[in-house]
Amino acid sequence: MARGQRLALLLMLVMTGLMVSPVTASAATNRVSGTAYYDAAVCPGPPAGYEDFTSYDGFVIEGSLEGCLYTNVLDTRETPSGVYLEMGEEVFVGSLDGGPVGTFATTYRFESKWDPDVSTGVEVHGRCQHPIVRGSGTGGFEGARGRLDFKDIIGDTVTYVYRGHIRLT
């Protein structure tokens, strides 16, 4: 067999193997996005093991992620110029794109600007970053890695949008 024919045969075998070998969705990086709002009636309380995660009402997450996010504030800072910073930890209970239910934990950092200040003003803008804690995933989020970013949409009622990525391994 000529060298060119052997190479073509090898290439065909490799391509055939790639087409028939299953690629699990869990190995993919999933881009996520959606909206969120606070509602204690929909998200009444954190799961077992996270009893301290009640700094705010439950945060309803809709979109690529469906479920509830619970927060434990660990530190806050504010400045006379109206900057408010908050750090803490969270746990999400829910699913990704209608898949199996599970949980994952995040740490987070929130930054916002208030006018004229935090105590007497109104929020001008806010955002937060939520890296997923490695090894925290259970159920449908076993092996989850990634990050979620939230942005506050300022209006008569503040609403929230998120985007990010989650890799399941």
PLM regions and their residue ranges:
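Sec-dependent signal peptide cleavage junction
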Residues: 20-28
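Bacterial N-terminal signal peptides
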Residues: 10-20
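Bacterial N-terminal signal peptides that target proteins for export
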Residues: 1-9
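Beta-strand-enriched cores of mature, soluble protein domains
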Residues: 27-169
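Compositionally biased low-complexity segments, especially N-terminal hydrophobic helices
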Residues: 8-12, 25-26
